Amino acid sequence: MEVNEAGRILAGQLGESFSNMEWACRAFKSENHLLRLKAPSTLTMRWLLNVLKSFRENHAKPKIEIASVWMDFDTVDFSREPYDCAILLGNGYFGESTESRLLFSEWLIPVCTPSLLEPARHQLPECDLIHPSPDRRDWKRWLKRTGLFPGLDMGGGIVFDTLEQGSLAAMHGHGVAMADLRLTLDALKSGLLALPFREAIATGDGYYLVWPKNSLRGQSIERLLAWLNLNAPVVPSLDIVCLDFNEKRI
């Protein structure tokens, strides 16, 4: 018996359909066993690795497979990228096909080594400013919101791609960096970094756990979300002046 052209086409279509069914079944069966997570590099190094370590110590399932990547602007395309969920910095909207929950808000504040405290406080225009992004947006936002040092030249300084790189440069005494307050708590507590100013500004963005709507891994994602919320960094009493969008003390 010989299969004709129509039969070969049908066989190919059936083979593709069965492959899709097999993939879906595998995804369903692995619901409680593996969760693939995408996260920004600074957040991963400063907070997430320790939180995931404690998650593994307290939960047998799911296993978390993390990919820490550099992103100029945090995005994820679940239809093209091999992730089940992601932690992204943004305003909470990451597309109509996604769900998201806020973990914590972003607050920016200048940091430097203890030896640079006084020069930074009183002679900031003479100090090297460390920028965690090429567009220098974080220093611009902080200066505008606080009203300090009007007319400060933004043309010079040291430019990096991430908050992590900027913070490391500040730790080595290369200048005054703009940092995320919550992600810098350990360095502040250990004395590696200090706060020349007490004004922290809200950017309006925050770190969100994001996942596709109708995900087959919903239970695992909810379990991870609960643990992330439980271990969100809390700012201690540091006499911080937190400025919201209306520049009011809160």
Region roles according to the model:
Residues 33-94, 243-246, 250:
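Central regulatory/effector-binding core of bacterial HTH transcription factors
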Residues 7, 78-79, 168-173, 188, ...:
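Hydrophobic residues within well-ordered alpha-helices
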Residues 1-30:
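Alpha-helical "hinge/linker" immediately C-terminal to small N-terminal DNA-binding modules
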Residues 67-128, 134-138, 143-151, 157-159:
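Acidic, Gly/Pro-rich loop/turn segments at junctions of secondary structure
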Residues 36-38, 86, 130, 177, ...:
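Short, well-ordered beta-strand segments
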Residues 57, 61, 185-190, 200-250:
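C-terminal effector-binding regulatory domain of bacterial HTH transcription factors
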Residues 29-35, 124-125:
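Immediate post-signal peptide segment of exported/extracytoplasmic ligand-binding proteins
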Residues 151-196, 202:
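Hydrophobic hinge/microswitch elements
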